[in-house]
Amino acid sequence: DAYDQEKLDSKLIELDGTENKSNLGANSILAVSLATAKAAAISSKKELFAHISKSDEYLIPVPMLNVINGGKHAENSTDIQEFMIVPVGFRTFSDAIKAGSEVYQSLQKNLSESNLSTTVGDEGGFAPQLPSNESALEILVDAITSSGYECGHHFLIALDVAAAELFDSESKLYNLVREKKFVSGEQLSEMYSTWVEKYPIISIEDGLSDDEWNDWEKMTRRVGSKVQLVADDLLTTNPIRISKGIESKAANAVLIKPNQIGTLSETLEAISLVQSVGWGTVISHRSGETEDTFISDL
């Protein structure tokens, strides 16, 4: 029965028979799970988002637009993997995208005029060679204002640090190549705290390495009241790990990636769990995935 999504997904999980869906593969299972949901929506003559939702109340999401790439997504750029602009001061989604495009074009122009590279990284953001991580924030603020918009009103800034890629498990330190130094989790949190006071930062994803639970708790106590702290690698869209994160108060928002957990039902369970305690959710694609638009309906 295509209308019984939970039963279908349970059957797929049972058929796979492994904890991490390694037999059939999470991507294969997810493809069947999502295709079934699409078929059921078409059959019932509903929009996909209406078919998925158990509520009649809908909210248009705010886009997070990746405009500067670093880390593993762009060699020789910043240590931080993604610098994003968040268009919050616009009446419609299309207005927000239009404004985001204008800032992107201004960013390209400003980089060119500063003799900085405008080649792009894996995620489509520019990957200039910059002297420091903070200089990327300064460049973003300049791009926003030179486009005729106001920082803090029309646009906010979000970061995906991907700190696990900087972390040395033996020394328990983070290698900031651009800063030419190694820092502790506490020092990294202190850096974020300084930036949050100085720049219109609204969200920091993967600010610390996965499984560094104590440091995540400390970071959340330190800056969690001022900024969204999004856990991706720490919680992996997994309801069990999300429950642990909620209990320990590590983070205050979760990145949701359907192909990280493997079925639509488990994805919706994770979203429901996160929202039940008032945490934020950020729906995300995966690097290198297809152009399928399913996640826009979640």
Question: Could you say what each language-model-derived stretch is?
Answer:
Residues D1, I13-G17, A41-K46, S53, ...:
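Generic secondary-structure signature for well-ordered alpha-helical cores
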Residues D1-I42, K46, I97, G125:
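Metal- or metallocofactor-binding catalytic centers and their adjacent structured scaffolds
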Residues A2-L8, A26, L48-H51, Q108-G125, ...:
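Flexible, glycine/charged-enriched surface loops at secondary-structure junctions
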Residues L12-T18, K54-Y58, I68, G89-F90, ...:
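Acidic, glycine-rich active-site loops and adjacent beta-strand->loop/helix elements
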Residues K46-M64:
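Glycine/threonine-rich beta-strand-loop-alpha-helix active-site module
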Residues Y58-G121:
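Mobile "lid/hinge" segments at catalytic clefts and subdomain interfaces of large enzymes
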Residues E82-F93, S117-N133, E165-E179:
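Active-site-proximal beta-alpha loop/turn segments in soluble metabolic enzymes
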Residues E134-L298:
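Catalytic core of soluble alpha/beta enzymes
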